Each structure stands twice: as structure tokens, then as C-alpha cells.
């Protein structure tokens, strides 16, 4: 009797523990699944233990046919973007090359005049004020300014050094004729004294300047006489 009682007690306990598992309900699971999956997904609730695995397989089977649309097209688009950027760079390079080949002299002069372009971009008022005396003189004496234009095209550094000498700019405002004479004599000064400060000191010597204006030949002989005396 005691043995039968224990068997009945065990059966009742197993039955009680078996009833705590809920029955499979298809309605809430199917409502959570995406609408583009196949209808076979609704039949995955056969066993509560197999539910997660079956749902995972069903979702993978539903996404796999759609992968060319959702995965391959964005990756192909991302691969095409660098090609589009490279194509745009090639088009700009070809346009610049055509511009350079069409007018090589203007392109080289534009690069040699880069310091003046930077000054014009940073301070346009100072750039215009600096160029005003030379523009007036160039309009008055175009043939005499031709060597300076050639110097600017050949050696922009030397041209810029000439333009930065303020006494010449002041002299250009006061007396254009004297300024042109000074500019024609400037290569001899630069050959005799490479230092710009020494050149300015030589230019400030009034007797030599007056002699250069009246008699340039005698002025050229003055450094030789001075070198022989000292």
C-alpha cells in the first residue's frame, strides 16, 4: 500500500509539473514576424523547445532570397562612389591641362606672380596702392617698362625685390623721369653691391644721383675712381 501511494504521488507530481508549460500560440508569434516572410513560418510552433531555432531558420530563409536587393545594391553603390569621385578629378585635371596647353605663357606668368596674387587676396587696398605708380608709369612709358615686364616673367624674386624698394616708389610719385633713370641704373647698383641696404645708401647720395641724371657716362666711371682712391 505504501509503495502504491508513493507511485501515485510521483505521477501526480509529474502531471503537476507538466501543466506549467504553456501551449503554443501561433497568433502572437506570427504578428511579430516580418510580413515579407513565407507563410510556412506560421507552422514553426510545433514544440516550445524548437521555437527559437525554427524562427531563426525561417527568418534566414526569408531574407536569403531578398539579399541581392538589400545587401548587394548598397555595397555596389558604395563601390561606385570612389569611381565617380575619381572621374570628376580626371575631368578637372583634363580641363586644367587644356588651359595650360592653350596658353602656356599666361599660366607660367600666373604662377610666377604668386606673391602678388597672395598680396591681392590678403589686402587688396595695399596691393592697388602699391601697383598704382607703376600702372601710371607703364601707361605713360610702355616701351621703357618692357625690360621690367621681362624681368618679372623670368625672375619674379628679383622683380619683387625691386618693387619693395620704397624710395623708388616715392620717386615715381614725384618725378617719373627720374624714376625711370633710377630703374635703368639699378642693375649696375645690384652688380656692384648685392646688399639692398647698400644700394639704398648709394641711391641716397645726392651728388651721384644728380650726376647720373645729367651725365650717365661720367656716373658709370665714378665707382672706378672711388675704388682707385680708397
From Swiss-Prot:
It holds the Pfam family Zein. InterPro entries: Zein, Zein-alpha. The keyword Disulfide bond does not apply. GO terms for molecular function: nutrient reservoir activity. It comes from the Eukaryota. Keywords: Repeat, Seed storage protein, Signal, Storage protein. Residues 1-18 form the signal peptide. The keyword Repeat applies. The alpha zeins of 19 kDa and 22 kDa account for 70% of the total zein fraction. They are encoded by a large multigene family. Structurally, 22K and 19K zeins are composed of nine adjacent, topologically antiparallel helices clustered within a distorted cylinder. Belongs to the zein family. Zeins are major seed storage proteins. This is Zein-alpha 19A2. It comes from Zea mays.
